[in-house]
Design a protein with these regions (language model features):
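E1/E1-like adenylate-forming module used to activate ubiquitin-like modifiers
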Residues: 116-117, 121-202
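Conserved N-terminal Rossmann-fold NAD(P)-binding element of oxidoreductases
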Residues: 27-29, 52
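Glycine-rich phosphate-binding loop and adjoining beta1-alpha1-beta2 segment
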Residues: 46, 51-89
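Short amphipathic alpha-helix with an adjacent loop that forms part of the alpha/beta core around
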Residues: 104-114
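Conserved S-adenosyl-L-methionine
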Residues: 42-48, 136
């Protein structure tokens, strides 16, 4: 009998789909990057999520965030994302953490229970803490670099942090990884130069 994951099973096989169903992924930051990550994972059949974000949907998020609509403005991002996941897969297990992840509260999270960690937060200190905690727990992690004011999707690449260029955030992360003796880190970054920022919306 066909279900919402039949095409995924046809593409990757039943064994792979079973692994996805058992997978537990933590996504830190449910915004322009993290929201699309969670959506794709849910549609792929990942069965268990931890969602971490303290923000609410703002009207200015509508141009780029998958959870943002006029109906969701003002609602907690993690709650909106939970509803979207369940509308795709009612059997998904979801734990919400309506908080900002900081080095000060990292001990509240048990990274060892995750199969994969996605860092989609903006704060450098938080990004570093997420990566270090995942590495310490032996859990695979991918970190998103700067995407603000960039419009060319063809310029995005998946690479090791030490092979990145142009991106200022990646430069800061490279320095931090060297300082903490982290030899490799998978990241998504763009070689595109950012567009000029608009100082004020009118």
């Amino acid at each position: 009998m066909l279900n919402q994951f039949s095409r995924t099973e046809l593409l990757f096989g039943s064994e792979a789909l079973a692994k996805l169903k058992k997978a537990h992924v933590a996504v830190f930051g449910i915004g322009g990057v993290g929201g699309h990550v969670v959506e794709a994972l849910a549609r792929s059949g990942v069965g268990s999520f931890d969602l971490i974000d303290n923000d609410t949907v703002a009207i200015t998020n509508i141009n780029r965030q998958i959870i943002a609509t006029l109906d969701t403005v003002g609602q907690p991002k993690v709650e909106v994302m939970r509803k979207r996941i369940l509308s795709i897969n009612p059997e998904a297990e979801i734990t919400l953490h309506q908080c900002f992840f900081l080095p000060e509260n990292k001990d509240e999270f048990d990274f060892s229970k995750y199969d994969y960690v996605v860092d989609a937060v903006d704060t450098v200190a938080a990004k570093i803490a997420i990566v270090l905690a995942a590495k310490e727990a032996g859990v695979p992690v991918i970190s998103s670099m700067g995407a603000g004011n960039k419009v060319n999707p063809a310029m995005f690449e998946v690479a090791d942090i030490y092979k990145t260029s142009i991106d200022p955030l990646a430069r800061v992360m490279r320095q931090a990884m060297k300082k903490h003796h982290i030899k490799k880190l998978k990241v998504v970054y763009s070689k595109e130069l950012p567009l000029l920022q608009v100082d004020e919306l009118k």
